[in-house]
Amino acid sequence: MVTVIAKSYLTEENRERLLEMSKQLVEITVKQEGCIRYDAYLDENDPNIMIMVEEWESKEALNNHTNSDYYHKIVSESAEYITQMPEVHICKKVL
């Protein structure tokens, strides 16, 4: 299993638009083969920080997701709504 934790920094004026785009991404992704979990959260202390938590059956399933047309479309469209590149951590469970 592969876990991804991605942290994005949103602009306040475009937060709702980016959340809508993220909702579309989640709705499509959870149907994708190999996706175990794909959730979006807002930081309680800073609502302009969004955290995506993903779990995939394998690295191959994750790669299929990140190479998909819909993923590239939403990521490229969302670039104008974030203040810096997302922090992405690809993790493996150790305990």
Residue ranges, per PLM feature:
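N-terminal first-folded block
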Residues: 3-30, 35
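An amphipathic, aromatic/His-enriched active-site/gating alpha helix that lines ligand/cofactor pockets
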Residues: 28-36, 55-88
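Short phosphate-engaging motifs
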Residues: 14, 48, 70
